[in-house]
Amino acid sequence: MSNVKRKDSKNRNLRNGESQRKDGRYVYKYTDIYGKPQFIYSWKLVPTDKTPAGKRDDISLREKEAQIKKDLNDGIDTVGGKMTVCQLYEKKNSQRKNIKRATEKGRQYLMNALKNDPLGMRAIDTVKQSDAKEWAIRMSEKGYAYTTIDNYKRSLKASFYMAIQDDCIRKNPFEFKLSDVLEDDTEHKVILTPEQEERLLAFMEKDKIYSKYYDEVVLLLETGLRISEFCGLTTHIDMQNKILNIDHQLLKDSEIGYYIETPKTKNGKRELPLTERAYQAIQRILKNRGKAQPLIVGGYSNFLFLNREGLPKVAGNYEGMVRGLIKKYNKYHTDKLPNITPHSFRHTYCTVSYTHLRAHETDQ
């Protein structure tokens, strides 16, 4: 009896591990790399079979068997390959918990985007490069910026790389250039020329509204601080040695309010010598500083820059101020200035510093 071959409804011999259910669907039973039984299904035994009417089309059982046998021979985790993209991304994130709040929020945004997209529920071993590209196109159609999509793609590429290292899949579907799929419409960094910088400052110095921000913009241009580092400055400044100690950022979140973060990079903690122009600006800022509300954030108090309520200013305050400043300047001048953000002052500072460094090296 043991030599009797099992047959399907079409009188075809079935191989070891193969069977056919009463509803006509074929089943293949195998043992995964962990020694646990697994099952795969298909309405077709071989590629030439037709899928029954009303049933979802799929590759045949024999094709699935061949792939599984190849995966098992190569040590591929066929079960791990069935985790969804959302599960993979969550697993990747679970391996690095000590992150900044902004990074945590960024992870939440991407996870929500995945949950609201067909890609998120796909098994990772079914995701092809064409699927990843279609995801990028859908994200663009939903209104996501190119840089955001590129950042999300980078995170997913890292997640799929982990899956490759864990022998769950063979290839990384996110191994492609986004610019081959979407047009890079990212606006280039705006850098003020020395002449534009002087025109802007001259306008601010005389303007009734924006003159009160003059010293703050001078300090941004002279130090190149990130705006969150700038907002984190306190009145405890080493004026005797003319040094700014940068060791934290001040940010504000709609959920938790003000909070302190370490600098963005490992080299972010630094001592910054003050130029004479910056030193004079700080002296005026300290002299004209209004009354502060009693507030301690992460052990820091006496923040240097205050809003009209006596609370620390944050990035949003300066973003709005700069927009209004440029709009008003361009309204009364034919020689228009480009639209800038507070971060543009940092770009300008870095460019000027690099130019001076190159000039010094040439002289040497």
Model-derived segments and spans:
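Conserved small/polar residues in nucleotide/adenosyl-binding loops
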Residues: 355-364
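N-terminal DNA-binding module of tyrosine recombinases/phage integrases
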Residues: 21-26, 32-133, 287-299
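Basic, Lys/Arg- and aromatic-enriched nucleic-acid-binding interface segment
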Residues: 152, 165, 169-171, 175-227, ...
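Short N-terminal "domain-start" leader segments
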Residues: 2-23
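C-terminal catalytic core of Y-nucleophile DNA break-rejoin enzymes
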Residues: 40, 260-284, 300-324, 341
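Conserved tyrosine-mediated DNA breakage-rejoining catalytic core shared by Y-recombinases
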Residues: 232-290
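N-terminal core-binding DNA-recognition domain of tyrosine site-specific recombinases/integrases
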Residues: 53-57, 93-168, 186, 208-209, ...
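Short beta-strand/loop motif that positions the catalytic acidic residue
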Residues: 352
